[in-house]
Amino acid sequence: MNQEIINNLYEFWEYIGKKIGRLVENDHYKAVSVVESDWPNRVFSISTGKDILSEIIDLIQGKLLPNIITVPKPTSLESHSHSKLFLKQRNMALNLKTVEIQSKNDENIKQVRTKEDALNFAKTASDAFGYKVDGNIVYLVSEDTSKVQFFTYLQNNEYLGCGIVFFDSNNNAGLHMIGTTPNGRGKGIGTKMTEKLLREAKANKSENCVLHASAMGENIYKKFGFNSFGELETYRILEK
């Protein structure tokens, strides 16, 4: 199951890269390279060959690849002199057959359908996570709702939260970018968004829901019935 969870994320990034024409891929790794956005600008799906990571780091330091790498733990990047860990996430999964959502849909949750919606999602996500999300990318990727759906939480004309569900080729639904802005925290918005995404996953007849949780978020998702598996780590590669 751990690999299926990772594959959902990698497949989502690959899907984005193809939609925006920025996917780099070969037998050893994949990358989405964008200048105008921090998301999903990175290298991923790296093969386990002995010298692959060193080659990728050389390409990054030569400005030929994005300087962010996401890999499963354990990884030799932990001890590499030119890498700096800045994000750890727990891989989690939930069998949707065990899930019944009792609460009603929250009317404040709106699906992204227009360019304006996409720009508002990007601004909300940027405020929630502290890195730049480009609305043009969101709009291009949101066009096929059978593959991916973007949502915002709008209350009293203020955008307070966001979330994404991505349906992969293994019939798993990945929950991504569930976040709240500083003004939206402590109001249960993340829980409401998670419930909405779970409903969409069940409506899609997905087998499992998968996600990648921070240390703070892991216990929240366990309350929904998610089980923890392995870990992902994201590193920034430093210049020489």
Where are these regions (language model features)?
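A conserved beta-strand-loop-helix scaffold within acyl/acetyltransferase catalytic domains
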Residues: 132-181
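Conserved GNAT acetyl-CoA-binding A-motif
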Residues: 62-72, 201-213
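Conserved active-site alpha-helix within GNAT-family acetyltransferase domains
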Residues: 75-85, 191, 215-232, 238
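Acyl-donor-binding surface of acyltransferase catalytic domains
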Residues: 46-107, 113, 235-237
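A short beta-loop-alpha structural element at the N-terminal edge
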Residues: 1-4, 49-50, 108-121
